[in-house]
């Protein structure tokens, strides 16, 4: 289990994602054209995949398959491409392995980008999804949709603030909105990357915050060309929090669960928990702000742990201290309002129980046979002084009580 946004090692991140995706980590990198998708894939592969390929020949071949990237408005990627061509099998230090690769897409067209037309007419290209040549725009969008729906297990949307390809931010918005809407419809986990020349600047962070409000998804400002391994680890860890929440394990004072089924306190707490469960869908929903429990009888709910590999979160529910005494009074009919009144009641009940235990067996006999005998306890017996008696040629000891 991890707490909140506790940092994980690269192995832990890979292992958790691999468990969530059944051992295949296929990252579909999608978004508008000329936003930096190929640059991101190249940097990701160089830092996160290639160093983990043990076979030197395989590593060299994978390096040759990395996409080309360049500045300007000309579209560099012309068809979807798996990077590397064959999935890389990566062994984890803690045991187990997974297969990983990225999928580079052409992306959705952006007004002002170059390369999708020839002689002022749509550029026709051949695509594995069509029997005949089709316009570049159509092939690009179809390929992107097929990659996300049929191949990728997780998604990364790469868009930009307009500082990376000589195209203003406004040009990217239609394509950006379309791809995010489609990802929401498909339901696969994804993260939004905002490619900027200055990702640490105030405008970049302000735009990222604005996008998070619009898309209701985490947005990470990055510089795709200069990403570090630590930044990529953070991206993957954030991506883990976009997986579905499968189970909520709740702990609360044990006496609450011992109440009769349907008790008013149980009903109010359980109903509040059901409402909370209905309002969260992803692991990240539990970490973005404190979980809220709408129940007047509780002191709140605390996130105590998360199992990112299987989608479980652990919550602890606190109960108002006065509620315990209130329910104790209701259930017993005794005037119990606090600890001071509880102790005398407990002492009195203990004496009553001791007295009852003496006659308990006799009462059971009465119910069974009509009469019962109350046997005295050891503390009630008085032993007389033993007396030696003689009867004929025999001696004995007479005990009287």
Question: What are these language model-derived features?
Answer:
Residues 3-131:
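Conserved G1/Walker A P-loop phosphate-binding module
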Residues 5-14, 19-21, 25-34, 44-47, ...:
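P-loop NTP-binding site
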Residues 91-96, 147-151, 182-186, 213:
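Conserved catalytic network of the ASCE P-loop NTPase/AAA+ motor domain
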Residues 106-110, 161-164, 197-200, 225-228, ...:
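Conserved nucleotide-binding/hydrolysis micro-motifs of P-loop NTPases
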Residues 113-166, 182-183:
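Inter-motif core of Ras-like GTPase G domains
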Residues 128, 153-155, 159-163, 168-169, ...:
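P-loop NTPase catalytic nucleotide-binding module
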Residues 171-177:
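Charged helix-capping and loop-helix junction motifs
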Residues 178-191, 196-263:
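Canonical P-loop GTPase G-domain recognition
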């Amino acid at each position: 289990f991890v707490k909140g946004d506790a940092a994980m090692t690269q192995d832990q991140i890979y292992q958790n994602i691999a468990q969530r995706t059944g051992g295949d980590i296929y990252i579909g990198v999608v978004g508008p054209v000329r936003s930096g998708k190929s640059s991101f894939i190249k940097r990701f592969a160089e830092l996160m995949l290639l160093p983990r390929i043990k076979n030197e020949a395989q590593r060299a071949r994978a390096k040759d398959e990395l996409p080309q990237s360049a500045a300007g408005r000309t579209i560099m990627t012309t068809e979807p491409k798996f990077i590397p061509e064959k999935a890389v099998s990566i062994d984890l230090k803690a045991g187990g392995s997974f297969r990983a690769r990225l999928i580079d897409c052409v992306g959705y067209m952006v007004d002002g980008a170059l390369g999708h037309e020839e002689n002022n007419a749509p550029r026709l290209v051949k695509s594995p999804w069509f029997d005949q040549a089709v316009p570049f725009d159509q092939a690009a969008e179809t390929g992107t949709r097929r990659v996300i729906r049929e191949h990728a297990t997780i998604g990364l949307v790469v868009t930009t603030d307009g500082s990376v390809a000589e195209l203003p931010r406004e040009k990217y918005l239609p394509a950006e909105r379309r791809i995010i809407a489609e990802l929401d419809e498909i339901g696969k986990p994804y993260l939004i990357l905002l490619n900027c020349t200055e990702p640490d600047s105030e405008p970049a962070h302000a735009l990222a915050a604005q996008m998070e409000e619009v898309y209701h998804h985490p947005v990470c400002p990055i510089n795709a060309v200069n990403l570090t391994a630590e930044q990529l680890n953070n991206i993957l860890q954030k991506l883990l929090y976009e997986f579905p929440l499968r189970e909520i394990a709740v702990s609360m004072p044990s006496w609450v669960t011992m109440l009769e089924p349907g008790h008013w306190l149980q009903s109010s707490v359980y109903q509040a928990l059901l409402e909370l469960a209905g309002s969260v869908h992803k692991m990240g929903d539990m970490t973005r702000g404190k979980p809220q429990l709408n129940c007047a009888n509780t002191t709140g709910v605390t996130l105590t742990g998360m199992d990112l590999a299987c989608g479980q979160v652990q919550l602890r529910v606190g109960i108002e201290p006065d509620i315990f005494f209130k329910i104790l009074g209701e259930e017993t009919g005794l005037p119990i309002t606090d600890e001071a009144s509880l102790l005398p009641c407990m002492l009195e009940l203990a004496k009553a129980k001791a007295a009852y235990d003496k006659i308990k067996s006799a009462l059971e006999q009465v119910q069974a046979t009509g009469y019962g005998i109350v046997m005295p306890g050891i503390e009630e017996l008085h032993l007389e002084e033993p007396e030696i008696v003689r009867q004929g040629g025999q001696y004995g000891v007479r005990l009287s009580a």
